[in-house]
Amino acid sequence: MNTHNARDSDDESPLESEEHLKRFFAGRNLYSQTKIDDARKKSHDAKYAKEVEWDAKDTAKGKPVFKKYRQEIADKTSRCDAQFINNLHTYYGNGSELRELPETHYAVDFMGTTIATTEMTAELKKLKVLKKKTATSQFVREHRQLGFIPTPSRRSLSCTGRFMNFETKCDERPDRTNPEFSVGNNNFLSATISNLDEDFKTPSNCEHVASIVPKEISNALTALIPHVNVFDYEKGEMEIGKVLCSNKNLHAYVIPKQHDQEQMLKDFSARFLAWYNKLSHLQRDTFGTDKDPKRSGKQEDGKPMKPYFWRVNVILCLQEFQEEGTMFRRARHVCGIRPHKSQPGLDLYIEIDTGSMRALKTNYLTVRKLPQEFANVPTPILEVRFEGAKTEEDVARRIAHIRKTGRAYIKSFDTGKRKIYQNSFFNGQPKDWSNIETAVLLPPKESSMSKLFCEDRDCMGLCCTDQWLENAESSPGISTIPASWIADKNKKPFVDRSPQKFKFPASGSYMKPAN
């Protein structure tokens, strides 16, 4: 290898290195080993589903069934995309036929095939391999109560003497104990937005006030999260459809790809229209306005009341979307704007279900305050923060990677008290709320050809390189069927050699435990 060239390649930017990898893989006869493993898992899942169906039928007839199948539980927080999971201690069958229950494994069973019986092996045989990870959790729980472990620790830490004095540093989380953000908060007032999506733009009729709008948009998004319900998400990989923007607090606002925004708009509009039709004529004219009886006569510290729509969640009535069935839309008031001195003032809103910006003239026919009954409808907008990102440049690089790959890895969630706060508005039956406020995203896994395995214990090798095989992949060992066999197939008697469906034996011997 030319060391001079190798040294030059180290100085290449990530984009230049990516182009080098594309040129390296182009035209080569390669295939992905992870796809073989995925096919095996799909085959197993299909067999497992059939057996579960048969088990349900047999159990319904009063026949007890003692079977447990292979359970593959991958680490969803790992950035390795080539994990091979083989949980030996929960593998009681292959999903297509019964297996006798294996004997309990001991630690000594994995040391060798032939081991002399010694005092050490006798002690090892007393240590059973646990099927559930209860011993470690019990150890951590007991020592946490004794004060040896001040904060929750990772399960993978070894239980040594040094572990007793180990102290972990929790990730800093934003203080969300009070859902109402204080106006005197300097960070709140000085916030601005960056890394805007192409579709997330200020409307054309208020471009000249761009110096004011970014700060107000950031404030509106930050205040929106505690006041609107969100979907429940799982840890692990998530497909991101759009990154709206980021702010100076190093948070970003994304819309996962799993949500159909058009369908959400139609569902909400139909739901709101059904609710609206049940109101009386007086309630239809006054709800969510200054004329609402629930609002009249109220003042704040002797000061004039702010408009009913001011920096709260509202309902927009957009006649231009009536034919599409999405006329009624949820939104958050951002700020008031005046395009020109000679023109009347407008108000800027951000839609809760799409993240789109709308500037329109506010009146009783176009804007109403959002009834509390609809606050628990989840929004697809998810607030995220990036683990390890310390500057806005770090956030910009992470957002650029998400927009390029369309994927992100959720490590954990920052939770608040949305459920307690929102249910305080209801005197009757409390509604379902999610306390998820911010998703913590792991740094992206960089593709590397310098090492075969990553740090994940279940890595099969060459992880995170499948993206380079998309255009160069070819299946190994492709075979063709001779034309002569096809011609003679109808002449020869055809014998179905496919395996028959497994049938339970008549006796109950299969339920006896293994010897």
UniProtKB/Swiss-Prot annotation:
Keyword annotations: Cytoplasm, RNA-mediated gene silencing
Record-level GO BP terms: regulatory ncRNA-mediated gene silencing
GO cellular component term, pick one: perinuclear region of cytoplasm
Region Disordered, annotated ranges: 496-515
Keyword Transmembrane helix: no
Signal peptide range: none
Keyword tRNA-binding set for record: no
Subcellular location: Cytoplasm, Perinuclear region; Cytoplasm, P-body
Subunit structure: May interact with pid-2, app-1 and prmt-5.
Function: Together with pid-5, it is involved in gene silencing mediated by a class of 21 nucleotide PIWI-interacting RNAs (piRNAs) that possess a uracil residue at the 5'-end (also called 21U-RNAs) and guide the Piwi protein prg-1 to its DNA targets for silencing. Together with pid-5, it is required for the biogenesis of secondary and tertiary 22G-siRNAs. Specifically, promotes the production of 22G-siRNAs from the 5' end of target mRNAs.
Protein name stated in the entry: Protein pid-4
